[in-house]
Amino acid sequence: MLSFNPDKPNFIVMVGLPGSGKTTTANNIGERFKMDVFSSDEYRSIICDSPADQSKNDEVFKRLYHDLRYSLEQGKSVVLDATNVSLKARLRAMAEIQGINCHKIAYVMTTPYETIVERDSKRRWKVGEDVIKKNFLRSFLFPAWGEGWDEIVVPSITREVLDCPYKEFETLWNDLAAKTMNFNQNNPYHSLTLGAHMGKTADILCNTGIRNDSIITAAMLHDIGKLYTQTTDEQGISHYYNHAAMGTLYLMSCPKLLGLDNYDACLQALFYVSWHMMAHDIKKGTDKTKSKYRRILGNTTYDLLLKFGDADTEAH
């Protein structure tokens, strides 16, 4: 799905956790399409003598963006090789190239979480799973169009995925339903099983008049990450930290489960799965916070996201 604008420089921003294969992919793109690659790890190696040293990140990114912007201004296409999993990081990337007429592409890595952790464990400069969870998974948000992208690339969503036979989708869906419908959330905030909660969320959205397939699909799958993030405290109550991010990663690694035959529809479903917990944070936020996200997302997406959050709450 990766395409370039031949009439202007292209700016590709890699988005992915440490160990997801960003650097290999970025270098392959750079070599194949003759693009300059700017790697935060390489700048750390120069400035700090170690790609793992985070102590001088301000200086690292100041120099990186200075050089990257210069290349774009010279009409060269570039790849930014950094994690960029947070909204804050991507908005900074956009701010740093402000005023340059270029084609902006978010390239989202779809490597399964288990593979990421395994790869990291074998690296010379290990990040560690605890740090991956605390510093990267916790801040992961799927790119939103309102950030300024001309294109969002999720390489796992291929024509084969979009043309997935119904029988294959049905098998995947039934296997998932067997897990979620019997999954006791073991939390006083939830009286329904996981599958029943997700189904009720979708029903509530339908009853409000929403007929958008992407949003209803997202509702049916929005808490799927809870299958992989359950922890239990000393009182025997379960918690599901980072479940929205984990669910998004899972769906990107198994996109046939979305059951959608349109690429943009798949992107929209992934957005709502990833952002559904943000709906609650936004609603509890200040007027300034609400204005910020309305400005970023646009009125339609912002309003739909809050409706999604309301349905999620009502379905408990």
Positions of predicted regions on the chain:
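Phosphate-binding P-loop
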Residues: 2-8, 71
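Conserved GTP-binding G-domain of TRAFAC-class P-loop NTPases and closely related GTPase folds
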Residues: 10-15, 20, 28, 113-168
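Conserved substrate/cofactor phosphate-moiety recognition/catalytic segment
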Residues: 24-76
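ATP-dependent NMP and nucleoside kinases share a basic, alpha-helical "lid"
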Residues: 46, 72, 85-125, 135
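Short glycine-enriched, charge-decorated loop/helix-capping segments at active-site entrances
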Residues: 50-56, 121-126, 233-238
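Short glycine-/polar-rich loops that comprise or flank the Walker A/P-loop
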Residues: 75, 100-105, 146-151
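Acidic/His-rich, divalent-metal-binding segments that scaffold phosphate/diphosphate chemistry
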Residues: 156-238
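Divalent metal-dependent catalytic cores for phosphoryl transfer on phosphate-bearing substrates
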Residues: 206-315
